Amino acid sequence: MKEKLIAVVLLFILTAILPIAVSKCSERSFAKPTVSTSDTPEKPKDSGEILCALTAGSYKDSYSAETLKAIAILMNTNYKANPDSFKANDFLYEENASGSIKDVYGEIKKAAESAKNKTLRKNSEALFVPYSETSNGITYKNENYKYIHSVASPWDCYQTDFDANAECVGVSLSGIDYLCKNGCSAEEALLWYLPDFEIADD
């Protein structure tokens, strides 16, 4: 009888304590989570880092330092003219670089630094300039870029990855590289493809 009485008393005590314990647990589970540093947004990139990342995104092992400068001027122009035209995979930031690109990222930084105040302009306006890796020996006009003219790009035929069906509007990066390796400055190479443009200091 004594044992039954103890069991009943314990049952009453547990019945009284259980709702309190449940409410404490539920308070914990609905508490606001703490924000870890991994949840905080990344520090915004400055314009120099963005230009480096865009230049690195177009890099090839064969490119000369002068070619990198030409690409940096082109990327600077396009980013200023239409920043929304770029996708996430167009950017290669230093912390994500690997292999040969990581080894030359210092050169890419130099090219970007030398180009950060230069833009391609037509009638004093920075306009988006389309580009391709290579052409089939000539660049084409396009209805979307009426300010771009067709020019000869015969040196693209010397490329090991030459494609007779490639259609390039604007600038051929392989052509720029050929011109830069054969005595042209970055500015001269760009203006070959864009004869109606000028390179202005911002």
Predicted feature descriptions by range:
Residues M1-D202:
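Conserved, single-site charged/polar hotspot
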